[in-house]
Amino acid sequence: VTGPAPLKFAGVNIAGFDYDALVQAXLNXGYLDSDNSGTLAINTETGGGNTASXVE
């Protein structure tokens, strides 16, 4: 069984993307492809908090 098609992440196709991490980013208040462009941009955490935000 093959996995899902690679996601286009920040303009780069990445095979075997960690979908659990993607879902967690969303749960942390991030957005998943908010304009349906097919490209996701997830910002890593900055500052001293425990939550990473994600915005396209």
Swiss-Prot record:
It catalyses: Endohydrolysis of (1->4)-beta-D-glucosidic linkages in cellulose, lichenin and cereal beta-D-glucans. It is an enzyme of class 3 (hydrolase). It is found in: Secreted, Extracellular space. It comes from the Eukaryota. One of its GO terms (molecular function) is cellulase activity. GO terms for biological process: cellulose catabolic process. The active site is at 45 (nucleophile). GO terms for cellular component: extracellular region. Its main location: secreted. Belongs to the glycosyl hydrolase 5 (cellulase A) family. This is Endoglucanase Cel5A. It comes from Gloeophyllum trabeum (Brown rot fungus).
